Amino acid sequence: MTTGNRDMKNPYYRALYPLYNPAAEKHWIAVAGLKKGSKAGSYELIKNFNEAGQGKWWTVAAPGNGIYSSTTDDHGNPGYASWGGTSMAAPHVAGAMGVLMSRYDQMNALQVRDVMFTTANHKNADGTNMEGWTDVDGTVRKDGEVSDRMGWGVPDLDKGMYGPGQFLGKFEYNMAKAGSLDVWSNDISNVALDQRKAEDDAWMKA
């Protein structure tokens, strides 16, 4: 589900659906759009697209500018053209999920989604934060936390090959069914759970 292209601090209502029906959250992925930055190897959130906002816990970001894709013209004739929008970003995330589901064929979709979320990246090639990672209020989220503009960050298939980065709930994985040794070398933290609890507690007190 895409966040939308309306320059808003929150996603379009369809991407924000789990806010109103929390049971849907585990089945949801929202996608925001990125573009290349002015420096080589840098990326930034596209400012006239909707941000993660209140949907940040199920949002990731992906390239959504200058994407060469199949299209149709006003008469329905097929062709190819360069397009921009969160609809161009979403297929990147669907592809990332497909790769990770192939890698972890004994996991269910929720577990694979959690791997994608908790191994997402928000760094440029030089190690600096992508523009748009900093929260609206100026808070710079640390590694493993979730931004109210970019969500979890950008799916990182390299890191995603080595297991989850955090456990967001009960997580069972049957190694015997996997059929062979499976090495998970990512450090496991709980910083996102701590962040969410702190934010939920603050909201309840407000």
Annotated model-derived regions:
Residues 1-4, 31:
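Active-site neighborhood of phospho(di)ester-bond hydrolases with catalytic His/Asp-centered motifs
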Residues 4, 85-87, 151, 156:
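Residue-level detector of functionally special positions within alpha-helical transmembrane segments
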Residues 6-8, 36-37:
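Conserved nucleotide-binding/hydrolysis micro-motifs of P-loop NTPases
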Residues 9, 90, 100, 156-158:
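Basic, gly/Ser/Thr/Pro-rich low-complexity segments located predominantly at protein N termini
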Residues 9-23, 40-48, 71-78, 123-147, ...:
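Surface-exposed intrinsically disordered loops and tails
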Residues 18-98, 102, 106:
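Extracellular S/T/G-rich loop segment that most often corresponds to the catalytic His/Ser-adjacent loop
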Residues 28-30, 102-205:
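C-terminal subdomain of the subtilisin-like protease fold in secreted/lumenal serine endopeptidases
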